[in-house]
């Protein structure tokens, strides 16, 4: 079971890293617009609605970010995972706490 989560975490991180590298600088899809880390979350391409666990692909990163569901997430990576789980219904709202 642990190996399964390690593989899933690695896959999610690779998807987000790949998206970060392919995005054009200054594109509006970056979450958040300012901060230590910005990601381009592929919520239109990747569906994780079947996944009901909480995963932090960026452990140790504290960069509060508010989602459109008015929940504060510890960092953009966690928000992206929640966005993938919701099929894109939860997205970036603003930087900082809600």
From Swiss-Prot:
InterPro entries according to UniProt: Kazal-type_SerProtInhib, Kazal_dom, Kazal_dom_sf
Domain of life per record: Eukaryota
Residues carrying the site annotation Reactive bond: 60-61
Gene3D superfamilies the UniProt entry points to: 3.30.60.30
UniProt keyword Hydrolase present: yes
GO CC field: extracellular region
Main localization (coarse): secreted
PROSITE patterns, per the entry: KAZAL_1 (PS00282), KAZAL_2 (PS51465)
Disulfide bond listed as a keyword: yes
Subcellular location: Secreted
CDD domains registered for this protein in UniProt: KAZAL_PSTI
Ranges annotated as spanning the membrane: none
Residue stretches making up the Kazal-like domain: 35-98
Keyword list, A-Z: Disulfide bond, Glycoprotein, Hydrolase, Protease inhibitor, Secreted, Serine protease inhibitor, Signal
Role description: May be a serine protease inhibitor.
This protein's name: Serine protease inhibitor Kazal-type 14
Recorded name of the encoding gene: Spink14
């Amino acid at each position: 079971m642990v190996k399964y989560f390690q593989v899933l975490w690695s896959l999610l991180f690779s998807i987000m890293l790949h998206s970060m590298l392919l995005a054009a600088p200054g594109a509006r899809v970056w979450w958040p617009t300012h901060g230590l880390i910005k990601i381009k979350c592929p919520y239109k391409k990747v569906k994780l609605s079947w996944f009901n666990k909480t995963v932090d692909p960026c452990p140790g990163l504290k960069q509060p970010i508010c989602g459109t569901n008015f929940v504060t997430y510890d960092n953009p990576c966690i928000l992206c995972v929640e966005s993938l789980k919701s099929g894109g219904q939860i997205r970036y709202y603003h930087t900082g706490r809600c």
